[in-house]
A protein has these predicted regions:
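Residues that form generic nucleotide/phosphate-binding pockets
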Residues: 12, 16, 20, 196, ...
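Extended, charge-enriched "interface" segments that sit outside catalytic cores
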Residues: 1-55
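Acidic catalytic cores of enzymes that act on phosphate-bearing nucleotides/polynucleotides
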Residues: 5, 28-39, 87, 188-191, ...
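A short acidic, often aromatic-flanked loop/helix-cap motif at beta-alpha or helix-coil junctions
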Residues: 3-7, 98-99, 166-172, 282-284, ...
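Short coil/turn segments at secondary-structure boundaries
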Residues: 37-45, 66, 70, 74, ...
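Glycine-rich phosphate-binding loops that contact phosphosugars or nucleotide phosphates
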Residues: 51-209, 227
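General structural feature for long, well-ordered alpha-helical segments within catalytic domains
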Residues: 9, 46-53, 75, 123, ...
Length: 312
């Protein structure tokens, strides 16, 4: 707990949550917390808009194609894994390789969602054009922080979902980028998710003795800097979380993948570790011999569901 006191960790996190400048390069605050708080007008309006459009899509379309990559894809795709009970077919297209989408035939009852913060992501926009051409703008929706570019592209204004430009891509699951959750769980599920996120934020502001997130974070720092263990293994034993590793890699490695501090000074310590892992039952039959009998050490997290559902 001395580490927290000396480095003022809890207060620094609180400063980020309340909206103080944390991106010193662009002189911006971090705003994804505002969607969880739900007490600022423009953020509440964004949420009303996403719920309204989600209802419109559920009522009028049979399939949903989401053109997205990176932070606009990883979180929503994880939500689809967790919450989709096969009532709505949702197909993600990253646009990274034509083989991903070359066989797709768009129908009139398909909803087409372009999800891009900048609305300038090459893979996202080019794959939409390849798949849809210029024939389906009436079925198309945009989720973006750059409304003018979406309008110029041809998306109808009433089909554009805006969100704040200071919401980082790796945290955009808390923003309207998370249309998927609204489609699958409706208003109550969406609000419950945000409330859960806020409760975790509040827990992270508690004193170190009552703060599990802080304690685990210090453990990671000790492994990485004192014990020279450079990788963190994340294993999931719940099928719905089988792709959680991809989401967690972005959240941690994009956030902490730095070699300079907030004042642009070169650091003399290790920052984030390398995150890897997978779905437990599959991984046990691929790389677990290395984990248990190999010469490399890793900081290990095992995530399980409360009920044992595994078929041994």
């Amino acid at each position: 707990y001395k580490y927290a006191e000396v480095n003022d960790v809890i207060q620094k996190f609180n400063n980020i949550v309340i909206g103080e400048i944390s991106n010193f390069t662009e002189k911006k605050s971090v705003t994804h917390f505002e969607y969880k708080k739900g007490n600022k007008k423009n953020f509440v309006e964004d949420q009303r808009n996403i719920l309204s459009i989600a209802e419109k899509i559920r009522r009028n379309f049979k399939r949903v194609f989401i053109f997205s990559i990176g932070g606009s894809n990883l979180g929503p795709s994880l939500m689809n894994d967790i919450f989709n009970k096969n009532d709505l077919e949702i197909i993600f297209i990253t646009g990274s390789d034509p083989d991903e989408y070359s066989s797709i035939q768009i129908q009139e009852d398909d909803a087409l969602v372009i999800s891009s913060k900048s609305f300038g992501t090459l893979e996202t926009l080019s794959s939409y054009k390849e798949v849809c051409g210029n024939n389906f703008y009436h079925n198309s929706f945009a989720i973006t922080a750059n409304k003018s570019k979406a309008l110029d592209f041809g998306i109808h204004e009433e089909n554009i979902i805006s969100f704040d430009s200071s919401t980082g891509g790796r945290f955009s699951i808390w923003s309207p980028i998370n249309l998927v959750l609204c489609l699958l769980e409706g208003e109550k599920g969406y609000k419950d998710f945000l409330q859960g996120g806020k409760e975790m934020d509040d827990a992270c502001l508690k004193i170190p003795e009552d703060n599990p997130a802080f304690q685990l974070s210090v453990q990671d720092i000790i492994y990485n800097n004192l014990l020279n263990v450079e990788t963190t293994l994340v294993m999931n034993y719940d099928y719905k979380l089988r792709n959680f590793i991809s989401f967690s890699q972005q959240v941690e490695m994009e956030s902490n993948g730095k070699s300079i501090d907030s004042n642009n000074n070169k650091v003399d310590y290790q920052t984030g570790s390398i995150i890897w892992g997978g779905y437990g039952p599959e991984s046990q039959h691929s790389f677990f011999q290395h984990v248990f009998q190999g010469t490399k050490q890793s900081n290990k997290y095992f995530i399980c569901s409360r009920s044992d559902k595994l078929n041994y």
